Amino acid sequence: MEKRIGTFYGVSVGPGDPELMTLQAVRRLENCPVIAAPQTPKGGMLALDIAKGAVELSGKTILPLHFAMSLDPAVQKAAHIEAARAVKEYLDAGQDVAMLNLGDVSVYATFGYLQEILEAEGCKTVMLPGVTSFCAAAARLGQSLTGGMEQPLTIAPGRCAAEVLAAPGAKVLMKSGRQLPETLAAMADAGLLSRSAMVCNCGLPNEEVWPDLTDYDPARSAGYFATILVKEG
């Protein structure tokens, strides 16, 4: 009899509000025996907390995944390999594993690194889409991301602001908190502060909304989950 190998699922939990999780995500988590989720050095597991708001997870095996915050590619890769190894132990035992991902699993998500490693080892992987932080932020602000069917939309990390602001169309600058002073300076140089808005921790209890960044103090911390929307100038 052929041995069953588990499937590795990348499950999107949305930006913060559990009500934004899809029915597909909820059902997959209900049926998956092992739930993997990133854990911070201080023990926080935000994606798991969000999922618990929509799914009863008691009785599940919770697998914390530790990812290095270092910018050193070698350090990052070592963390990805170690996380993939931990997941594969359950897959080899015939258990499905669902990895929780903030926002959508296809957008700046750690799942992709583990997916590449595990697929190379013959494991089956499946991605379940979800609501992105920038779509939720646009809805929170009550504004369209694009002004029309023909307008381009550029999505980039906040650290790339200086390079993308000159491009045509609207822009989304994700995870902008760490480089916020530099990002705001680039936007000021481009004359786009008055056409920009920011939502921090969208859908979470500590959510903050800034419809206009003209008077935002660059020294004020916005946190890691800061999403900036820039209308075309």
Enumerate the predicted regions with their spans.
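Short secondary-structure transition/capping segments
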Residues: 85-91, 108-117, 144-149, 172-186, ...
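Class I S-adenosyl-L-methionine
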Residues: 1-18, 23-124, 210, 216-218, ...
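Short gly/pro/ser/thr-enriched loop/turn and capping motifs at secondary-structure boundaries
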Residues: 42-44, 70, 132-135, 204-206
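Structural signal for conserved beta-strand scaffold positions within catalytic alpha/beta enzyme cores
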Residues: 37, 63-66, 127, 147, ...
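Class I SAM-dependent methyltransferase SAM-binding "motif I" and its flanking Rossmann-like core
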Residues: 106-167, 219
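A contiguous loop/helix-start segment that scaffolds small-molecule binding in enzyme catalytic cores
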Residues: 8, 97, 165-233
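Short beta->alpha linker loops
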Residues: 46, 102, 129-132, 159, ...
